């Protein structure tokens, strides 16, 4: 299934309240601070998708995945964009039961999909502005995720990522905090910090998926 081998999936600002319940929410880099939901570690396997390509019940499915097979092709300046479709999608067939067009017009289902993609693209642009705002205040920094397996005396760093620096966030001047609060950025920044508790759940999910014990939770798995 789509995104079955993805370790991370893009998410937008409006998805944070739902996505933070399942995934660590991080940024791709400081140069490209796109917001991502972590779905796996070490292996090219999405731990929320089963071997049949189905997402786990009750796990939040990011809009990036739900919009598929539709997507956006945009100019670099972002002034113009076109909604596109993946012609390699297995569900796209000649003479299928659900047509994309009727009488040279988009069907209601196609129009709904196009509207969803357009809304997603607008949300993505707002998310980019949020990330740039955090970058202006140097709040996106390289971080390490740690886990202490049973029997270990010290935590082990198992992932490097870019995320909100809590110390820098707390150290902002009152004036800057107030400015960020007015823009709704403070609450979202703390929501990203709260999502970091899901790193432990990601490792536990990996251990369960591959039958690993606490000591072997970092062990690489051979996959095709």
Stretch-by-stretch model annotation:
Residues 20, 60-63, 125, 164:
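Short, well-structured alpha-helical interface segments that form or flank functional binding sites
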Residues 13-18, 61-63, 134-139:
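Short linear motifs in intrinsically disordered
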Residues 1-43:
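N-terminal ordered "arm"
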Residues 19-22, 66-68, 139-143:
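A short, compositionally biased
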Residues 1-5, 44-49, 53-54, 123-129:
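Short, basic/low-complexity N-terminal boundary segments at the transition from targeting/disordered tails
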Residues 26-28, 34-100:
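Aromatic- and glycine-enriched beta-alpha-beta binding-site module
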Residues 72-224:
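A contiguous, surface-oriented mixed alpha/beta subdomain in the mid-to-C-terminal portion of proteins
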Residues 12-13, 23-25, 57-59, 132-134, ...:
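Intrinsically disordered, low-complexity boundary segments flanking structured domains
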């Amino acid at each position: 299934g789509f995104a079955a081998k993805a370790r991370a999936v893009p998410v937008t600002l409006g998805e944070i309240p739902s996505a933070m319940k399942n995934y660590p929410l991080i940024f791709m880099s400081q140069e490209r601070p796109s917001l991502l939901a972590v779905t796996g570690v070490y292996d090219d396997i999405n731990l929320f998708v089963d071997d049949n390509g189905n997402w786990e019940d009750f796990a939040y499915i990011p809009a990036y995945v739900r919009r598929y097979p539709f997507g956006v092709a945009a100019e670099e300046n972002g002034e113009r964009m076109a909604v596109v479709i993946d012609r390699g999608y297995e569900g796209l067939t000649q003479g299928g039961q659900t047509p994309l067009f009727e009488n040279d017009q988009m069907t209601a289902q196609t129009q709904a999909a196009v509207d969803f993609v357009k809304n997603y693209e607008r949300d993505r642009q707002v998310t980019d502005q949020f990330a740039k705002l955090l970058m202006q205040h140097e709040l996106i920094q390289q971080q390490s995720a740690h886990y202490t397996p049973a029997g270990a005396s010290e935590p082990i760093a198992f992932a490097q990522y870019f995320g909100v620096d809590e110390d820098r966030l707390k150290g902002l001047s009152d004036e800057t905090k107030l400015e960020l609060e007015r823009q709704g950025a403070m609450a979202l920044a703390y929501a990203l910090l709260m999502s970091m508790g899901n790193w432990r759940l990601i490792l536990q999910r990996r251990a369960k998926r591959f039958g690993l014990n606490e000591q072997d939770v970092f062990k690489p798995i051979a996959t095709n």
